[in-house]
Amino acid sequence: MKIKITACQFRVEKVSTFHEFQEQVEDLITQVPENSDYIIFPELLTIGLSAAFGEQDASSVIRIDEYTNQYKDLFRSLSRKRKQVIIAGTHLERRENEYYNIAYIFDEDGSVVEHKKTHIFPAEANWHTSEGDELEVYSVGRVKIGIAVCYEAEIPEISRILSVNGADIIFCPSYTFTEAGFWRVRHCAHARAIENQVYFVHCPTVGEPGSPLPNGYGRASILSPCDSAWPANGIVAEAVMNEHTIITGTVDMDELYENRKSGAATTFKDRNRRKGMYAKYKPYEGLK
């Protein structure tokens, strides 16, 4: 079974109305092939809307929550119209008295499931966002998928839990502020693809949302394990750095399943094979 994936590398800029933001989204999505099974947008792609509130400090970025209903309505409409699954990046939303960085997955009928980012990057602390406590594998579209938002790709346990619970593709919307930050997430994303024998789709926010918010830096990619079934470097598709653009690639699920059985490096099953040895060391005991 072959799955076509499109990553929309979104270039944020200051916008003063939701209509301007919507035009940016539609500019990219109209370039997406009609037969793509999954479309992904990056983390906090709505952050340029913070300019609508005038000069402010970084902590006031949470005010973009005021656009939550319009944001959801837009992507619900697009998923229904296009009959495609859309991972609509992430957006800051208020739930009771707390704000969460939430990834929304819209099925082709407009229904939605969500994932609250579980590990907040240290620099995000200034935005006063809270952390989610759940990891879930979603049966949305033709395969089972998981979400690892940016910094979550740097926490190996996240992708391991998702993969052992059935996720074959992990989607990673991200927003990194520096070249080093981009490569940190990218290298970790590829490590997760190799060690769990999954496909990993990394989709970063790029552009300039305006002071005091940091610029986005990155290059979208569709990543595979490094083995004979795929390009030697494990890159199925890759975008131009820091451009407002899309990439599309096709991944073969049968090749992935066969690779787990008989690939050169069968890391998915071999990690379980020695779990008795790992248990001796109780890695989380003594952590403070």
Regions found by a protein language model. Give the residues of each.
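Structural motif
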Residues: D37-Y38, I145, I169
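C-terminal beta-strand edge segments of enzyme domains
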Residues: V137, V206-K288
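Extreme N-terminal starter segment of soluble prokaryotic enzymes
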Residues: M1-A7
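CN hydrolase (nitrilase-like) catalytic-core segments centered on the catalytic cysteine
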Residues: Y67-V85, E154-E243
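Cys-nucleophile CN-hydrolase/nitrilase-fold catalytic domain and related Cys-dependent amidase chemistry
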Residues: H19-E108, F177-A191, E195
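Short polar catalytic/cofactor-binding loops
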Residues: Q9-V15
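Active-site catalytic loop in hydrolytic enzyme cores
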Residues: R94-N165, T178-A191, A265
